[in-house]
Amino acid sequence: MQTMEGRQYNYQDSINASSSMVVPHSPWHSPVPYLFGGLAAMLALICVALLILACSYWRLSGSAERDLEAGDDAKPDNDTNKTKHTEMPEKFLVIMAGDVRPTYLATPATRSEQSCTCGDHNEEEGRRG
């Protein structure tokens, strides 16, 4: 027995008391489960995103083979699919910028060779002379 600061201290009693009060150590007090749980959640999120991308690509490639708007529900032959391409006219949208907000939307003007006399020098010489 030892005396510490006026008190008696029995070293063997403290060892026996501490060994009898063993508190079970929970694995959730460590950061390791949270680390692996976060990594697993990120990996699952990436897998779900890749699965969605693959399904949307598969669905888009399947719809390109048949034309639903034309009423062709069955898959067409490869020969007829190649000859049915129709060209759509190109559409342009020009926004004329202003100081605060756009001033107006530009409308495309059709050019015809008869109305354009920009490069015709014969008419200019005829007017002058």
From Swiss-Prot:
The VIMAG motif is necessary for the function of the protein. The keyword Aminoacyl-tRNA synthetase does not apply. GO terms for biological process: amino acid transport; regulation of amino acid export. Belongs to the GLUTAMINE DUMPER 1 (TC 9.B.60) family. Overexpression of GLUTAMINE DUMPER 2 leads to free amino acid levels accumulation and plant size decrease. Residues 66-89, 106-129 are annotated as: Disordered. This is Protein GLUTAMINE DUMPER 2. Residues 1-34 are extracellular. It comes from Arabidopsis thaliana. Residues 56-129 are cytoplasmic. A motif (VIMAG) lies at residues 94-98. Residues 120-129 have a biased composition (Basic and acidic residues). It is found in: Membrane. Probable subunit of an amino acid transporter involved in the regulation of the amino acid metabolism. Stimulates amino acid export by activating nonselective amino acid facilitators. Its main location: membrane. Keywords: Amino-acid transport, Membrane, Transmembrane, Transmembrane helix, Transport. Expressed in the vascular tissues. It is a single-pass membrane protein. One of its GO terms (cellular component) is membrane. InterPro entries: GDU.
